Amino acid sequence: MNDPDQSGDAGTKGIDARKAALALLRAVLERRRPFDEALAQTPALNDLSTRDRAFARLLVASVLRRLGQIDAALDHCLDRPIKPKDLILRQILRLGAAQLLFLGTPAHAAVSTSLELARGPRHAGQRGLLNAVLRRLAREGEALVAAQDDARLNTPDWLWEPWCAAYGEATARALAAAHLREPPLDLSCKESPDRWAKTLDAEILPGGSLRLAAGQGEVARLPGYGEGAWWVQDAAAAVPARLLGDVAGKTVIDLCAAPGGKTAQLAAAGAEVIAVERSENRLKRLVENLERLGLGAATVAADAAAWQAPAPAEAVLLDAPCSASGTLRRHPDIAHLKGPKDVAALSAAQDRLLANAVTMVKPGGLLVYAVCSLQPEEGSERIARLLSEHQDLERVPVAPAELPGMTDAITAEGDFRSLPCHWDEGGGLDGFYACRLKRR
């Protein structure tokens, strides 16, 4: 049931890590800020050691991954529901429960540090409840967790129901299980993957990506980062650009291009890339990434749904904004911050982007549409609608030889559909959908 505790220190530093975790959890669940954004903007994290910062992140990620289980266990141990105005108490209980149930923290450390978080007049009269609930959880938690349906509890309806409809309940359960694990770190190399695999003690995956075990710490400290030898990119995220084939010497338009992993792929393959991104801040990050890698691309700050290309291109790649439900392993906040209304709004935006992207493709050229989403509404359903409206487009099915080691991810229609439970024993994949189209 438990994972190894990464911060057994229940002293001052342990308290500081948990205070930072509380601030981070509140930023996500109360102020509804994305996990990565909250990580970057929580001042309490800055003063922690690397080890304690990693623990604070792991603790909050564990709460977000297992929120359904944690809340069910807490509700079992509470005589009456916590009042809505006592949200901070609920967050402290969640952090304590995650340590007791899933991180292997000794009960005395989990309870005492949780009580320390509840000091002050705001929590007058609450410390007794906090102590009683967590001590009961320490006694009964193992049996409670063993009896839980973790897959169903941890997966909100807006995800569970479409997954069951699209993939079947067994696969939906496998997806939920995959989302509980920290993902490995995948890299794309500019060149010499064999050399960097040896230097980084990494596995070379069938598509050429490098895979390192989870828990590598700060990416910028790894060999090769400073010299621009590689960039972080999940193995599944590297597939859409590869579906364009040999792009050397060709003009390729990369729409919604930031943060630039696919732009880097295309530039490294010899393409003349035009990278279009609506957000100037994200475009700035893309340029910085390309500069680190020693790669070049023309960049345009514009809305890809309205921008007009200077001339039709031989290839267009559209990695559209989406719910990102395929990246829950890395972004567990998504399950709690998004919902059906977001998927509907994003689907409409994807239709607008696709309609404009088609106009940028010259006859005989290719369009690849991709989303890091598991929701059919954002993937195959968007392509079905596009094809119904454009007789000048035809699907170009993906051949098994194009995706060594990933043939299970090729759909009956010939599209690419990776799932987090693919390559499960080897660390899994992000959930991606990609379809390749040709303009007649």
Where are the model-predicted features located?
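S-adenosylmethionine
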Residues: M1-R440
